[in-house]
Amino acid sequence: MEKKNYIVAIDLGSSNVVVAVAERDAEGRPVVRSIVSKPSQGVKAGMITNIEQVSNSIKAAVETVGEELGIRITEAYTGISGDFVRCARHTDHVFTSDPQNGVNRTDVEALFDRMRNVQAPDDETIMERIPQNYLVDENQEVADPVGSFGKRLASTFNFILCAKTPIERLNLALRRLGIRSLGMYANALVTGAAVLSADEKEEGAAVVNIGGGVTDVAVYYRNVPRYIATIPMGAGAINNDIRTLGILERHVDSLKRKFGSAVAELAPENKMVSVKGRTAKETKDILLHNLAVVIESRARDIAEYVAQEIRDSGFGDKLAYGIVLTGGS
């Protein structure tokens, strides 16, 4: 792989693994050349449970991209998601070096150094440190403190933490394929950066990504990621509920996508649909209203967890743009 030209991203989910390859144009901007999605196995709610299955899943997607573009992938950026990813805030301060001439970059860097010295618990690693605000002399809140007058500079940082075990397992799967991880990022943050507009990030929005095994939530306000969380429940839970209607697993997803509704009162009361059974001649009739009732029940569960996470963020009343939904489920 030509390192200077290609950028590779691998997103391992509970139901699919996606590999995206971009190439830098003459001005250095990334242009997507290929996106491949393959079913994944060996992942439950974001946690790798079977290294052999995961390696094979990633290999299938990587090889497809490689054949399509005529390259061999040896390094990639990766995303990670699960309830083992969380955020925590920490506040610290420094005294400015030259109060008469205002806060300078050296003061800001000194504050960053203090934040870089903050240690994670033994079983976690810090993925990112994101400044939330700056406070000069405890009463002047500013987005950029350089030039402000004061003796004391404080800030609250949002630390993005991840348990070490899932990181180690994902890196192991990549190493088995001869792929070096260039960096690992929380999917909730990546989704927010990719999906939300500049206005949504500035005025406040929560992006909710409903995946197969998990639902990621990220809250943005004043162009800063304020909070992230992962709910260990996604479209897979809805699919499992639909199976209780007597539907074979291989028909569940297509039934949901073609006839499903998350609002039962909008589904026709008496309309039925026939679903294939275990043999070519066997069918099962399902009331669309009953299908919608099952979907709505689980969708409400997910929505309630999302609402609680937004409340826990402390920014629920500041989201002018509300909630932005995304995901392939």
Protein language model annotation of sequence segments:
Residues 240, 289, 293, 297-304, ...:
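Feature representing long, continuous alpha-helical segments
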